[in-house]
């Protein structure tokens, strides 16, 4: 089967936004306009398409699929058909893991901002993640019809708050209820959309006289940015004072793909204006899979290799989301980086070292799913029938194994005990929790060895709340939830040199003998545990050295102060001794464990607590209350800023343990007019009085 759309005409994009910026409406309109251009299966007449839109509007759809495929020929039908795969990204900070996961498989992104609210805290988190994965992006300022809408204010905020380099390629005609359309700065024509056809038809008209100066000024800025793409263009621009349309588009495209600039557009999705021009910008400026560097991975021998976005390459893909579908069961969404695969083929899950047969392959479209026989480089699809795969796994050709760059998922910072309400819920709860943990790698489930309770851990109170709610809605499990517990850690602040660990046991017959000497020192934050074998002259035989390491690793799970996991330490195994008959692995494991415990006591152990980056948006009148309250929670205020449309943003770093129930107290502090977001920042040493309270609470 030949490829329907050349890979150069693929666009794998995400649409990302703060909760209220209007992402769903924007995405919905994209599906509507692309659906009008290209119908899958039977071709409807215009009226039926409109009906579909209306009925979807009544239901207030959100795309439930993790990836949806649409087609676009340009708003004037002037492009060859392009295939746009839209990957859904959530808009809440507790789910940044979801955003991170989708950023990993995107080639480009549309960042949607509210013309009134501007750049909000969540927008910054998403922007940072897009920077981390070097995702080229566009900015779309939505809700231009709302009271207080201001395109140029959002432009300033993108520069100041995100340190972005936005380049407007359109300028709005009017704002608020007078928002009429946009001026296309590349064509220097105004675009007015036809309201009767819900924006599917439009006219190019002359620029309104009152906007002529503004447009001239912004066009000059845009052309200058384009000219900076190369020396030749700059010379051409200096000679002629302008550049041809094709040169401008190509130069802006090159600079967008290099992440140097972000083309900026605007509109109102709700009123059917502007999304059409944004889709053209996706084609003009965002990369196809062949425009970005090939994906890198690791071969079996540990060497680095890359896989080019080509059908001729060996097959490689990444599973990026797992969903449970009421009709077909578990769906694994995967992004194909190279090669071709057919339903029925055997794949290797190289992350887990297991082979599996690929069952059905589904492609999701706006309002229906299509079963397909094969997928090729650049495609995004869902697989049915893969039992082993979880988020972040590489699925590849069994004859050519490769593990693509692994996704790094954050450690949970909060945990709660959950108990089923009835005996019948017990079994269902186990199944439900496992299924949810499979879908979401930042959610963990374990059993507390001492109490036998089931403990769930995640990225924040809301994260756990939503998972418990899903357990009830999707799996019918009623559960009671304990008080949230903070995930503390232990580490050391000084070095303990040459500490002995000796395990000797003589009890008739063969004894036990293991002796290890270690030096323990602090490691860099986030580096975890490192072990260095510095044994000389065979004082400990080679085969027993891994046992010492294993003994230490077992002990790391429970520190000497209050039994919290130990992080960021280096251990040097420097000396030891053995007995020809009595030494064995177990004895050296015990010796390693004893040496580590003793060394840790001597190395100034401390308790670490998770610190959260908290941002509060509040009207100015309540500023004093909010700041005082944050200080009372051991918070350190790190800055304040004015918000678009009045109000203040307070940024602070606050220990997680002090933030429980914060939403309730913020509501009363600011009479329900303040909002906040919170995300994990780093671990920090707990002050002595706090650490003492934590240790004594743990020992009760």
UniProtKB/Swiss-Prot annotation:
Disulfide bonds: none annotated. Keywords: Cytoplasm, Elongation factor, GTP-binding, Nucleotide-binding, Protein biosynthesis. It comes from the Bacteria. GTP binds at residues 17-24, 88-92, 142-145. Pfam families: EFG_C, EFG_III, EFG_IV, GTP_EFTU, GTP_EFTU_D2. One of its GO terms (molecular function) is GTPase activity. InterPro entries: EFG_II, EFG_III, EFG_III/V, EFG_IV, EFG_V, EFG_V-like, EFTu-like_2, G_TR_CS. GO terms for cellular component: cytoplasm. Catalyzes the GTP-dependent ribosomal translocation step during translation elongation. During this step, the ribosome changes from the pre-translocational (PRE) to the post-translocational (POST) state as the newly formed A-site-bound peptidyl-tRNA and P-site-bound deacylated tRNA move to the P and E sites, respectively. Catalyzes the coordinated movement of the two tRNA molecules, the mRNA and conformational changes in the ribosome. Belongs to the TRAFAC class translation factor GTPase superfamily. Classic translation factor GTPase family. EF-G/EF-2 subfamily. HAMAP family: EF_G_EF_2_B. This is Elongation factor G 2. It comes from Burkholderia orbicola (strain AU 1054).
